[in-house]
Amino acid sequence: MRIILLGAPGAGKGTQAQFIMEKYGIPQISTGDMLRAAVKAGSELGKQAKAIMDAGKLVTDELVIALVKERIAQEDCHNGFLLDGFPRTIPQADAMKEAGINVDYVLEFAVPDELIVDRIIGRRVHPGSGRVYHVKFNPPQVEGKDDVTGEDLMTRKDDQEETVRKRLVEYHQQTAPLIGYYGQEAQAGNTRYVKIDGTQSVDSVRAELENVLG
């Protein structure tokens, strides 16, 4: 079962990715993790990636695709894999297809921008433990304080409204066109495209995923 997750930052992909990995026994492939692992291992591709990153440049699509191919050939991907955060653009999706990396399901988590902003800017984190709260959806017992230690909670830089809105603009410009791309791929019978209402509760989304993936 080879799956691509699509959806804006804050659409709930991370939570559901965890569920899919555990339920279906397939690993999540993150291009960031893959790049770090290749650099650390000092593989041929890792050396190339390191040279590009050290020069302050973005790693090319070709190199990322080569890393994905190398990664999915490993034993733990025998039953499939879950791609989140890649492909981000239509050229990357085309390159994946040309490299013979086929996908069974493309799952789009659809959530309106304003709800995403609401979800993200309300997050509060306890730095010591990583415990996450939300001022509206999961508030601490005492406002601004961690339930366990009573220490102050903080807002991550990434969770500030200006940053969130920037990331959403980037998503709509770069990644949203993939929705049309994979819709056409599904019509051609090359994959199954499923749009999931990400505004539902975590459990409802989970039930829908089980229904789709079997």
Swiss-Prot record:
<protein>
    <recommendedName>
        <fullName>Adenylate kinase</fullName>
        <ecNumber>2.7.4.3</ecNumber>
    </recommendedName>
</protein>
<feature type="region of interest" description="NMP">
    <location>
        <begin position="30"/>
        <end position="59"/>
    </location>
</feature>
<dbReference type="GO" id="GO:0004017">
    <property type="term" value="F:adenylate kinase activity"/>
</dbReference>
<feature type="binding site">
    <location>
        <begin position="132"/>
        <end position="133"/>
    </location>
    <ligand>
        <name>ATP</name>
    </ligand>
</feature>
<feature type="region of interest" description="LID">
    <location>
        <begin position="122"/>
        <end position="159"/>
    </location>
</feature>
<comment type="function">
    <text>Catalyzes the reversible transfer of the terminal phosphate group between ATP and AMP. Plays an important role in cellular energy homeostasis and in adenine nucleotide metabolism.</text>
</comment>
<feature type="binding site">
    <location>
        <position position="200"/>
    </location>
    <ligand>
        <name>ATP</name>
    </ligand>
</feature>
<feature type="binding site">
    <location>
        <position position="123"/>
    </location>
    <ligand>
        <name>ATP</name>
    </ligand>
</feature>
<comment type="subunit">
    <text>Monomer.</text>
</comment>
<keyword id="KW-0547">Nucleotide-binding</keyword>
<keyword id="KW-0418">Kinase</keyword>
<feature type="binding site">
    <location>
        <position position="167"/>
    </location>
    <ligand>
        <name>AMP</name>
    </ligand>
</feature>
<dbReference type="InterPro" id="IPR033690">
    <property type="entry name" value="Adenylat_kinase_CS"/>
</dbReference>
<feature type="binding site">
    <location>
        <position position="31"/>
    </location>
    <ligand>
        <name>AMP</name>
    </ligand>
</feature>
<dbReference type="GO" id="GO:0044209">
    <property type="term" value="P:AMP salvage"/>
</dbReference>
<comment type="pathway">
    <text>Purine metabolism; AMP biosynthesis via salvage pathway; AMP from ADP: step 1/1.</text>
</comment>
<dbReference type="InterPro" id="IPR006259">
    <property type="entry name" value="Adenyl_kin_sub"/>
</dbReference>
<keyword id="KW-0808">Transferase</keyword>
<feature type="binding site">
    <location>
        <begin position="10"/>
        <end position="15"/>
    </location>
    <ligand>
        <name>ATP</name>
    </ligand>
</feature>
<feature type="binding site">
    <location>
        <position position="36"/>
    </location>
    <ligand>
        <name>AMP</name>
    </ligand>
</feature>
<dbReference type="GO" id="GO:0005524">
    <property type="term" value="F:ATP binding"/>
</dbReference>
<feature type="binding site">
    <location>
        <begin position="85"/>
        <end position="88"/>
    </location>
    <ligand>
        <name>AMP</name>
    </ligand>
</feature>
<dbReference type="Pfam" id="PF00406">
    <property type="entry name" value="ADK"/>
</dbReference>
<feature type="binding site">
    <location>
        <begin position="57"/>
        <end position="59"/>
    </location>
    <ligand>
        <name>AMP</name>
    </ligand>
</feature>
<dbReference type="Pfam" id="PF05191">
    <property type="entry name" value="ADK_lid"/>
</dbReference>
<keyword id="KW-0067">ATP-binding</keyword>
<keyword id="KW-0963">Cytoplasm</keyword>
<dbReference type="InterPro" id="IPR000850">
    <property type="entry name" value="Adenylat/UMP-CMP_kin"/>
</dbReference>
<keyword id="KW-0545">Nucleotide biosynthesis</keyword>
<dbReference type="GO" id="GO:0005737">
    <property type="term" value="C:cytoplasm"/>
</dbReference>
<feature type="binding site">
    <location>
        <position position="156"/>
    </location>
    <ligand>
        <name>AMP</name>
    </ligand>
</feature>
<feature type="binding site">
    <location>
        <position position="92"/>
    </location>
    <ligand>
        <name>AMP</name>
    </ligand>
</feature>
<dbReference type="InterPro" id="IPR007862">
    <property type="entry name" value="Adenylate_kinase_lid-dom"/>
</dbReference>
<comment type="similarity">
    <text>Belongs to the adenylate kinase family.</text>
</comment>
<dbReference type="InterPro" id="IPR027417">
    <property type="entry name" value="P-loop_NTPase"/>
</dbReference>
